[in-house]
Amino acid sequence: MNDTTGRIPLWIIGTVTGIFGIGLIGIFFYGSYSGLGSSL
């Protein structure tokens, strides 16, 4: 329990980064296909 206090497990970092990356790419492509990508 004391090991996770100052250090985040690697699988949590990978999962959060993966979800954030997929969401960001999805929003980017959705905006570009909708015509809002140029305004952003």
UniProtKB/Swiss-Prot annotation:
Domain of life: Eukaryota
Keywords assigned: Membrane, Photosynthesis, Photosystem II, Plastid, Reaction center, Transmembrane, Transmembrane helix
Pfam families noted in UniProt: PsbJ (PF01788)
Annotated membrane topology: Single-pass membrane protein
Cellular localization per UniProt: Plastid membrane
GO cellular component: photosystem II reaction center; plastid membrane; thylakoid membrane
SUPFAM superfamilies: Photosystem II reaction center protein J, PsbJ
Transmembrane segments: 8-28
Record carries keyword Nucleotide-binding: no
GO biological process: photosynthesis
Subunit structure: PSII is composed of 1 copy each of membrane proteins PsbA, PsbB, PsbC, PsbD, PsbE, PsbF, PsbH, PsbI, PsbJ, PsbK, PsbL, PsbM, PsbT, PsbX, PsbY, PsbZ, Psb30/Ycf12, at least 3 peripheral proteins of the oxygen-evolving complex and a large number of cofactors. It forms dimeric complexes.
Family, as annotated: Belongs to the PsbJ family.
Function: One of the components of the core complex of photosystem II (PSII). PSII is a light-driven water:plastoquinone oxidoreductase that uses light energy to abstract electrons from H(2)O, generating O(2) and a proton gradient subsequently used for ATP formation. It consists of a core antenna complex that captures photons, and an electron transfer chain that converts photonic excitation into a charge separation.
NCBIfam families assigned: PRK02565.1 (NF002722)
Protein name: Photosystem II reaction center protein J
Organism of provenance: Cuscuta reflexa (Southern Asian dodder)
Primary gene name: psbJ
